C-alpha cells in the first residue's frame, strides 16, 4: 500500500540550478508537523538541476525526469498525477516561501473546510529588496 500525505508540494523544474538549492532548503526547513512529499518534476533540464536534487538525499523528495521539455503546466499536471497528498501546493523552482507557509495554509484550509487557499505574492529582485505586491 502506498503512503498517503497531508500535502504534496509540486515543483516544476527547467534549468533552475541557480535557484534550486534555496527552493529545496526552504521546503526541507518547513515548520510543519504533518506529513508531506516534495515532487520535483524535471522538464528535461540541460543544466545541473538533477544533480542538485539528488545531492539532497532526502526521503521527502521524489524526482521525476521527463524525456523532453513540455513546459511548466505539463510538468505540474504530471506532478498532480503522482501526488498522494490531501492538499497540493505549487511552488516554482525560482520562488521562495517562509518556513511556516505549509503549516499556515494547511491549518487555514483544515480549520475552515476550504478546498483552496493561497497567500500573498511579492516580487523580490536579486538584491532581496521588496519590489511590489503582485497578488
Regions found by a protein language model. Give the residues of each.
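Nucleotide-sugar donor-binding/catalytic module of glycosyltransferases
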Residues: 1-135
Amino acid at each position: 500500500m502506498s503512503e498517503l500525505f497531508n500535502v504534496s508540494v509540486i515543483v516544476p523544474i527547467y534549468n533552475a540550478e541557480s535557484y534550486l538549492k534555496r527552493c529545496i532548503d526552504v521546503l526541507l526547513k518547513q515548520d510543519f508537523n504533518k506529513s508531506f512529499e516534495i515532487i520535483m518534476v524535471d522538464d528535461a533540464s540541460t543544466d545541473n538541476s538533477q544533480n542538485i536534487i539528488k545531492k539532497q538525499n532526502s526521503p521527502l523528495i521524489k524526482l521525476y525526469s521527463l524525456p523532453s521539455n513540455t513546459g511548466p503546466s505539463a510538468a505540474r499536471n504530471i506532478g498532480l498525477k503522482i501526488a498522494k497528498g490531501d492538499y497540493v501546493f505549487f511552488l516554482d523552482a525560482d520562488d521562495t516561501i517562509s518556513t511556516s507557509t505549509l503549516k499556515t495554509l494547511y491549518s487555514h484550509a483544515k480549520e475552515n473546510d476550504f478546498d483552496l487557499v493561497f497567500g500573498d505574492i511579492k516580487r523580490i529582485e536579486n538584491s532581496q529588496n521588496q519590489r511590489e505586491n503582485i497578488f
